């Protein structure tokens, strides 16, 4: 990063930023009546208007030069193609693969990983449909009314964001809860709201070694087993989202 901010193009951008600050947005529109058209983009239902920002054609040219200087285009292509962009773990990132269409195909290490990804997505959809249709029921036969996510960091914020973003479309018969720390107050407050007989717990941990998540899962599982002693009951009320299925099975899920 230090080399980047010392580069000539970065210095040019810095000077340009100081210069453009002296101009008001209204002046930029007076100077160029076509400004709104030049500094806006549209794609299907999306429309982006950045004409009301301190940006000129020179700004875009300088930013493009900066992108070229760090091979941004090639880095984006590497990310999308499954190249090893995570130098620490020597792994591809593949975030974008989760959103690739089923028929696209993405070969990584000689295998089409989209086949595996869409198999997991299909499994998720089937599970959701079972819950929505009341086919997935608790051990006692009662329908699921509450879903609790146990996770921390991205394993908490990701699902939480999805629930908030899709709130207008959610199944009104379901309530969602999130436990992300080991605070007794949060757990006790949750236990006052839910009924084990109608609750589905989702333990979310990529490695299935996250201390806080497993501690909460252990506490809840212990309380659950005090009420339901049959081992089969766990399958109706606990799920794991993880890359380490073996560890989840060892845990008892």
Model feature map: region roles:
Residues 9-11, 181:
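Mixed-charge, polar/low-complexity N-terminal
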Residues 126-134, 140-253:
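Glycine-rich phosphate-binding loops that contact phosphosugars or nucleotide phosphates
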Residues 4-9, 16-29, 33-140:
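Extended, charge-enriched "interface" segments that sit outside catalytic cores
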